[in-house]
């Protein structure tokens, strides 16, 4: 592996970011739960869902970061700014297309996460880390730490941000984030076997 760098990304990198996240989150509880157990083409549904998540950040002009190994994107992070405005029309239209494709039940399952996340709000303005993912073949190489450091720098640079928030649905990640200095502010059970920590 050559020298790695964290780079600011933009809309032109969406396909590569989605590709990284589809690999990193392939078996992630949120994705499996929202898409549903009986779907015929999980890979395509996962791509549709993750593309929506990434495009939401693009429509809001949120920060996008990536770790590149030469020209190959191997890890990425997407964020929300503390002063983010309401959803633009393009995002609302994209959202309706997504739920038309994934179905009413998938939408309800996703909204159950949104309800849980909204019940543990952080009052102070902050930068929110929406997604952070590393290709599975590159796990254990410190790439998440590189991205988290860059995310923290983004927060420090923003005049209205008092810190960084995130949520995880993988209990193994809780101790990892605590190691990086995060504190649990909320926990909720979404469905049998599916929990979220903020």
Model regions and ranges:
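A short beta-loop-alpha structural element at the N-terminal edge
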Residues: 5-19, 23, 27-31
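Active-site rim helix/loop that mediates acceptor-substrate recognition in acyltransferases
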Residues: 39-63
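Conserved beta-hairpin
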Residues: 60-77
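Conserved acyl-donor/pantetheine-binding loop and adjacent beta-alpha core of acyl/acetyltransferases
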Residues: 73-133, 139, 192
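Conserved GNAT acetyl-CoA-binding A-motif
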Residues: 125-127, 155-169
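Conserved beta-strand-loop-alpha-helix junction that forms the acyl-donor binding cleft
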Residues: 130-139, 165-175, 191-194
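Conserved acetyl-CoA-binding loop-helix of GNAT-fold acetyltransferases
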Residues: 131-134, 140-153
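Conserved active-site alpha-helix within GNAT-family acetyltransferase domains
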Residues: 145, 157-160, 170-187
């Amino acid at each position: 592996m050559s020298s790695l760098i964290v780079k600011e990304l933009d809309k032109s990198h969406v396909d590569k970011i989605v590709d990284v996240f589809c690999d990193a989150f392939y078996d992630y509880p949120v994705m499996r739960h929202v898409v549903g157990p009986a779907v015929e083409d999980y890979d395509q549904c996962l791509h549709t869902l993750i593309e929506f998540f990434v495009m939401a950040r693009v429509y809001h002009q949120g920060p996008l970061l990536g770790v590149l190994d030469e020209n190959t994107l191997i890890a990425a992070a997407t964020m929300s700014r503390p002063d983010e405005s309401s959803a633009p029309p393009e995002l609302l239209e994209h959202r309706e297309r997504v739920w038309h494709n994934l179905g009413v039940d998938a939408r309800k399952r996703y909204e159950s996460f949104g309800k849980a996340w909204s019940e543990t709000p952080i009052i102070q303005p902050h930068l929110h880390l929406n997604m952070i993912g590393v290709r599975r073949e590159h796990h254990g190489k410190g790439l998440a730490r590189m991205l988290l450091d860059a995310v923290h720098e983004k927060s420090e640079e923003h005049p209205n941000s008092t810190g960084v928030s995130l949520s995880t649905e993988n209990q193994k990640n809780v101790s990892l984030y605590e190691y990086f200095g995060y504190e649990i502010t909320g926990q909720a059970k979404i469905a049998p076997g599916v929990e979220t920590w903020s």
